[in-house]
């Protein structure tokens, strides 16, 4: 008997507006991804991360999908990723989205069942992130940008997408310091102090000024979380269109056209850590044929 597998690729995302201060946020898909491969096994749930990451979120997602379809099935999910964990690049949202879609596609095909709608898969992935304690707000902004690709602007409390559109194709440069930052361990009361100013950044993105929104948000959260805003300013000085902290850090993201790419890398190369170069992802989470 042929073993049926379903493989799904899901992009990470970078922050335009961090939703923790106000409950409203914005993010866009990036070209670093999680890939999840799902297949049926005799019984139980097996989850394996090729990078050795914690699999509890994957296991929760898998069990939630099995429960949704009401089938007696064993499922194995194996993930691989070039998306760093605990870095502010939505690794948890991408892993949730990839796992939910892979297992859903597998079970609906194998058992001849009605596939889940996109919004159902997205909501299930967000529920799993909240239940697993890897997110403060459920990260609906990050999760929706990862799921649909492009730019999303969201009300995380209401789980509502206010705006969704393709993102202009730009280079995305990411500075990753030699430290991790788990969102659920962040100082939430301190971030909520920023609400009036984060609201100003939020209005910028609604008015189409994504670059200024990203930069303002990124510098505000640097102040709240104790990161050095000079890292973003160095990128801006080198020609970046926008630069700021992504998520709750520790990664910084800069958007640029190709002509400034080398200058920004030069500006960051003396910092401890790595600089990654990728691009905007407008495809989102999808089953690979």
UniProtKB/Swiss-Prot annotation:
Q: Which SUPFAM superfamilies match?
A: GHMP Kinase, C-terminal domain, Ribosomal protein S5 domain 2-like
Q: Per UniProt, which keywords does this protein have?
A: Amino-acid biosynthesis, Aromatic amino acid biosynthesis, ATP-binding, Cytoplasm, Kinase, Nucleotide-binding, Transferase
Q: In which pathway does it act?
A: Metabolic intermediate biosynthesis; chorismate biosynthesis; chorismate from D-erythrose 4-phosphate and phosphoenolpyruvate: step 5/7
Q: Which GO terms describe its biological process?
A: amino acid biosynthetic process; aromatic amino acid family biosynthetic process; chorismate biosynthetic process
Question: A Pfam family in this protein?
Answer: GHMP_kinases_N
As its record notes, the protein acts as a catalyst of: shikimate + ATP = 3-phosphoshikimate + ADP + H(+)
**GO molecular function term, any single one:** ATP binding
The protein's location, in the record's own words, is: Cytoplasm
Q: What is its main location?
A: cytoplasm
Q: Per the UniProt record, which residue ranges are transmembrane?
A: none
Q: Name one GO cellular component term.
A: cytoplasm
PROSITE patterns named among the record's database cross-references: GHMP_KINASES_ATP
- At the top of the EC hierarchy, this enzyme's class is transferase
Q: Which NCBIfam families match?
A: Shik_kin_archae
Q: What is this protein called?
A: Shikimate kinase
Q: Which organism is it from?
A: Methanothermobacter thermautotrophicus (strain ATCC 29096 / DSM 1053 / JCM 10044 / NBRC 100330 / Delta H) (Methanobacterium thermoautotrophicum)
Whichever gene encodes this chain, its name is: aroK
């Amino acid at each position: 008997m042929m073993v049926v597998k379903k493989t799904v690729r899901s992009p990470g995302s970078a922050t335009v507006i961090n939703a923790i201060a106000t409950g409203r946020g914005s993010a866009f898909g990036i070209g670093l991804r999680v890939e999840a491969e799902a297949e049926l096994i005799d019984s139980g749930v097996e989850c394996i991360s090729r990078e050795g990451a914690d699999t509890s979120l994957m296991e929760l997602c898998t069990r939630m999908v099995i429960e949704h379809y009401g089938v007696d099935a064993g499922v194995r999910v194996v993930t691989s990723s070039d998306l760093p964990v605990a870095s502010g690049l939505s690794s948890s949202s991408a892993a949730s989205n990839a796992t939910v879609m892979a297992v859903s596609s597998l079970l609906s095909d194998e058992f001849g069942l009605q596939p889940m709608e996109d919004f159902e898969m997205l909501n299930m992935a967000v529920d799993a992130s909240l239940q697993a304690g890897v997110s403060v707000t459920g990260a609906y902004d990050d999760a929706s940008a990862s799921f649909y690709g492009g730019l999303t602007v969201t009300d995380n409390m209401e789980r509502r997408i206010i705006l969704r559109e393709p993102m202009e194709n730009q280079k995305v440069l990411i500075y990753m310091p030699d430290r991790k930052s788990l969102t659920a361990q962040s100082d939430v009361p301190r971030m909520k102090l920023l609400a009036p100013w984060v609201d100003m950044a939020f209005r910028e993105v609604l008015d189409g000024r994504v670059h200024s929104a990203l930069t303002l948000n990124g510098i505000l959260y640097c102040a709240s979380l104790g990161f050095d805003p000079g890292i973003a300013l160095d990128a801006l000085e080198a020609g970046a269109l926008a630069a700021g902290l992504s998520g709750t850090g520790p990664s910084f993201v800069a958007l640029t056209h190709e002509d400034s790419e080398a200058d920004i890398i030069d500006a960051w190369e003396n910092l401890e850590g790595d600089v990654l170069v990728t691009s905007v992802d407008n495809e989102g989470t999808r089953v690979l044929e």
